[in-house]
Curated annotation (Swiss-Prot):
InterPro entries in the cross-refs: Fert-Immune_med_protein, LY6_UPA_recep-like, Snake_toxin-like_sf
Membrane topology annotation: Lipid-anchor; GPI-anchor; GPI-like-anchor
Name of this chain's protein: CD177 antigen
Lipid modification (GPI-anchor amidated glycine), residues: G408
Species whose genome carries this gene: Homo sapiens (Human)
Length: 437
């Protein structure tokens, strides 16, 4: 048996004769700058493509007044070779969209675009007209009261829409407001695809809610009595069919307590609602939640945990009982056998040791819990599987594995290392809001 046939039978994929795998520059950029900040430059990563694939560069600039959105995709492609091409999809006056595309196979790293100069053509100031329009480019949403600009001469209508960009490592929603020379929802001027990036346009205002966004995990001794801040400065735009949500879960074991909260867009199909639920009541461990789904911009605006605490019945000072139990809440770890012990209140005659797994709303964590309960078979969530945006699962007397955020591990395309020194990394901050989660 030949060596080639043997390798094929063992599952090895052999390149076709004459077809060589290329190395390509690789990465994505999605950002909004001031027009005066252009041109920009970047440092791409490298990637090895499958045999037969080429390298591609796709760059687009969307300009509205003093702002410009830059979208860049670099990587491998199945598309046929194409010479560098600059396309003016829509030029002013007012909003404009221009792109650069290139596909090559002649050598490694032939997609070597490292700056926005091919699309950089400073324009002289336009003569002002009589129309004023809100001007905004944002991946987080344009808020009411956005600054209005005097539109250039030749524009007659204000544009307000949402561009959805999908493909080539790009997955984003761009809210666009600005000046246009005609009415209607036609910023793209018929364009449906630029390079590997598919584009759709929507001007139905009800289809793109803007919601507050952020997660928080806080552990303290008196969170069940004293309200704490629950605000975030970040926002996000929702997909069609989503509404805004805010979910807050309180766990109080006596000596310590934990709040877990999230704000953002809901799952598709959620209905408007607001409620407070006591899942486990004293004597012993208290577990309660506040959930709110709503369908107007920034309606998930509760500013403190008082929205939950004010709905809880007042608790008298507990009368000590005869049982002692370890007490602990570890939202990002495991309670140990050496947890502090406390005398349980009268009526709480058993010790609880288990964990609750929460996932959803940008958060995934297993919380280890120890405390006093009234019944030996008590489940703190009373078999509840959904708390607002959170999917919940409870187990007793099991050591949970290590916690991690949703989406942990390798993501899709790597982002670029900026030559201008801009870098952002999501993080979960202990005891404070994590807006980027």
């Amino acid at each position: 048996m030949s060596a080639v046939l043997l390798l094929a039978l063992l599952g090895f994929i052999l390149p076709l004769p004459g077809v060589q795998a290329l190395l390509c520059q690789f990465g994505t950029v999605q950002h909004v700058w001031k027009v005066s900040d252009l041109p920009r430059q970047w440092t791409p990563k490298n990637t090895s493509c499958d045999s037969g694939l080429g390298c591609q560069d796709t760059l687009m600039l969307i300009e509205s007044g003093p702002q410009v959105s830059l979208v860049l995709s670099k990587g491998c492609t199945e598309a046929k070779d194409q010479e560098p091409r600059v396309t003016e999809h829509r030029m002013g006056p007012g909003l404009s969209l221009i792109s650069y595309t290139f596909v090559c196979r002649q050598e490694d790293f032939c997609n070597n675009l490292v700056n926005s100069l091919p699309l950089w053509a400073p324009q002289p100031p336009a003569d002002p007209g009589s129309l004023r329009c809100p001007v905004c480019l944002s991946m987080e949403g344009c808020l009411e009261g956005t600054t209005e600009e005097i539109c250039p001469k030749g524009t007659t209508h204000c544009y307000d829409g949402l561009l959805r960009l999908r493909g080539g490592g790009i997955f984003s929603n761009l809210r666009v407001q600005g000046c246009m020379p005609q009415p209607g929802c036609n910023l793209l001027n018929g364009t449906q695809e630029i390079g590997p990036v598919g584009m759709t346009e929507n001007c139905n205002r009800k289809d793109f809610l803007t919601c507050h966004r952020g997660t928080t995990i806080m552990t303290h001794g008196n969170l069940a009595q004293e309200p704490t801040d629950w605000t975030t400065s970040n926002t996000e735009m929702c997909e069609v069919g989503q509404v805004c949500q805010e979910t807050l879960l309180l766990l109080d074991v006596g000596l310590t307590s934990t709040l877990v909260g999230t704000k953002g867009c809901s799952t598709v199909g959620a209905q408007n609602s607001q409620k407070t639920t006591i899942h486990s009541a004293p004597p012993g461990v208290l577990v309660a939640s506040y959930t709110h789904f709503c369908s107007s911009d920034l309606c998930n605006s509760a500013s403190s945990s008082s929205v939950l605490l004010n709905s809880l019945p007042p608790q008298a000072a507990p009368v000590p009982g005869d049982r002692q139990c370890p007490t602990c809440v570890q939202p990002l770890g495991t309670c140990s056998s050496g947890s502090p012990r406390m005398t349980c209140p009268r009526g709480a005659t058993h010790c609880y040791d288990g964990y609750i797994h929460l996932s959803g709303g940008g958060l995934s964590t297993k919380m280890s819990i120890q405390g006093c309960v009234a019944q030996p078979s008590s489940f703190l969530l009373n078999h509840t599987r959904q708390i607002g945006i959170f999917s919940a699962r409870e187990k007793r007397d099991v050591q949970p594995p290590a916690s991690q955020h949703e989406g942990g591990g390798a993501e899709g395309l790597e982002s670029l290392t900026w030559g201008v020194g801009l870098a952002l990394a999501p993080a979960l901050w202990w005891g404070v809001v994590c807006p980027s989660c």
